[in-house]
Amino acid sequence: MRRYFGTDGVRGEAGKPPLTPEFVLKLGQAAGAYFRTQEKRPVVLLAKDTRESSDLLEAALAAGLMSQGVRVEHLGVLPTPGVAHLTKALKATAGAVISASHNPYQDNGIKFFGPTGEKLPDEAEEEIERLLLEDHPTRGIGTVGDFREAERMYLDFLLAHAPDLTGLKVGLDLAHGATYRIGPKLFQKAGAEVMAFFNTPDGRNINRGCGSTHPEALSRFVVELGLDLGLAFDGDGDRVQFIDRKGRLFHGDHVLYLAALAFGEKGVVGTVMSNMALEVALKERGLAFHRAAVGDRYVLEKLKETGLALGGEPSGHVIFLRHHTTGDGLLTALLTLKALKALGGDLADWYEALPLYPQVLLNVRVSDKAKVMADPRLGEAVREAEARLGGRGRVNVRPSGTEPVIRVMVEAEEWAEEVARELAERVRALSQEAQAV
């Protein structure tokens, strides 16, 4: 069982275990030792987001890697999917990103990509964790460089997929994060009239009241300013949420439905959080629908298993496998707008084409996720909730892979909110009991 790597790399509060400079230095040494088993002279591309702790952790990770003879190429502030793309395009040994995605500024994280541009497989992360337990004396003096073409190369990749957006008025919520520079450049070059919001990072304002997890302000701006649509990215740019001209959230399930029809897909991979309405609508059109566990790495695994090319999550992580190896908010925005051009209409029209079942998602902060999830009384509570819905809805309770919370989701035509709140209270009570023991 992995101790440090979760569903999206190593995460935690910066400066506290495990994300201390000392630990990150050792992580760099262990990762460097692993990469030395893959190539004689490894090259690792290293990028970061805009958190105040990113510089410190970047320096520690780079030092650890270089102590093992690794060449480190600094990419500066760049969206996570840009690192994945460049790792593959430049045939680097690996890519690494200092970011905690949609989490608040106090948190940070480290994730690695392999030479194919995909996240490191579980076995590789397990081997790096094993190597963390060993001492790693200096095995050479690694060198460092600043790869100044990183943003331009990533921008060129994105523009190759961009439709002509001339005349489109777009609001961009950049979350004070990694897309704050490249986002406006991209949409302006594609011809759109751009209004950028939340694009002045100060190290502490990333995701604060903005971005894909807080699109309310963008929704208001779109309506008040008469924009055609809004795009809300998260802190590292691997997801996007859309706002239609009426200020409504056009989320990942809508995107999957629209893209599947526009691009002639044979089926779609969603997750256990995907709305039942998406599954029903796709099957009515003869398209397959498969559910994966939550997390883009599991969506990718299911895509490979089923041979499909389109998958994603309601949160805005969408993988267009013919074009990229990972979720990419900027690419998703471009391809969704291309799908609209192909089918006609705007986001508001397609929002109404897929009426979603009411869904309530509550996050319950807990002291010990594993203990609460293992409590048999939680299983009983879930079964009781399902019985109350009488087969006319779904219940899903799962631990977050990146935060100390358990997510309670209830989806039903009726009673969703009431059942979700009751179940969340049961989870909270079990957590308090576990903490008292």
Curated annotation (Swiss-Prot):
**Post-translational modification (record):** Activated by phosphorylation.
Q: How is the cofactor bound?
A: Binds 1 Mg(2+) ion per subunit.
Highest taxon of source: Bacteria
Where Mg(2+) is bound, by residue? S101, D234, D236, D238
Q: Name one Pfam family in it.
A: PGM_PMM_II
Which reaction(s) are listed as its catalytic activity? alpha-D-glucosamine 1-phosphate = D-glucosamine 6-phosphate
The entry lists its GO molecular-function terms as:
magnesium ion binding; phosphoglucosamine mutase activity; phosphomannomutase activity
Q: What is this protein called?
A: Phosphoglucosamine mutase
User: What is the native source organism of this protein?
Assistant: Thermus thermophilus (strain ATCC BAA-163 / DSM 7039 / HB27)
Report which gene this protein is encoded by. glmM
